Amino acid sequence: MILMIMALALVGCAVDNPALETEVQEANSSVYEVLIADYYNMVQFRLSEDVHMKLEQGEYYEISDTLEAAIPEEADYDWWCMFVEFPSGLTDPQVTDFGYLLKDINADGQPELFWILSDGRILALFTVWDAKPVLLGAYWPRSRVSVTEDGHLLVLGSGGADSQLYQVLQIPSNGEANILAEFGQDVGQAYQITDGKKESITQQKLTELIETYFEVETIDFSKEIQPLSP
């Protein structure tokens, strides 16, 4: 998942060709600039005083063709929930509460793009594959998303007071996120998902999985967040 991969052969030589690597990074930065502009417009629309009336009338914020193409169909629901809820938890939300971050989280030399709140909550994560941006995930503010030092994405989602889902994701260089571990509990019943199959587990096993995967050092992005601007 990563910045522009022009051809498979190109990827292999990028490490040994600093000039080519810089060229690829700059090209993908321009792709991200489009998404950052979309982000700013989305925040402006969502924070407008008459937003609820606009939504009731079927008026939505406009996004670029680039962003629209970056959101896979299966992510539509999560994207909409993120959009509706992202100001939650902010007493008096302003544009200054929102920022972005470019960070290479899988050590391939190319950064991913984070849409992130000033308090560190991650709203969305993008990468670039085949010269096009790809949405890796959109997250409700109630979710907790962090990145480990070894580049794994930790996602704690909630479907309610008694429903939690833990996911450990790896970000390879192919525009998709690989699930390394997935477990949680629903109405008090702990479970683990392996190869797409959901199986019940004990609370002790759930605790062990949480300790193994989630009680680890994560990266503090607070000093790297860039403010949104027109």
Describe the role of every protein-language-model region.
Residues 96-105, 143-153:
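Beta-propeller blade termini
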Residues 87-98, 145-146, 163:
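Repeat-based blade/solenoid architectures
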Residues 135-142, 178-184:
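Beta-propeller fold detector
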Residues 106-117, 149-156:
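Acidic/hydrophobic-patterned starts of short beta strands in beta-sheet-rich repeat architectures
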Residues 1-4:
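Sec-dependent signal peptide recognition
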Residues 14-66, 156-230:
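Acidic, small-residue rich beta-repeat scaffolds with periodic aromatic anchors
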Residues 123-136, 169-172:
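Beta-propeller blade repeat segments, especially FG-GAP/WD-type strand-to-loop junctions
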Residues 9-12:
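C-terminal motif of bacterial Sec signal peptides marking the signal peptidase cleavage site
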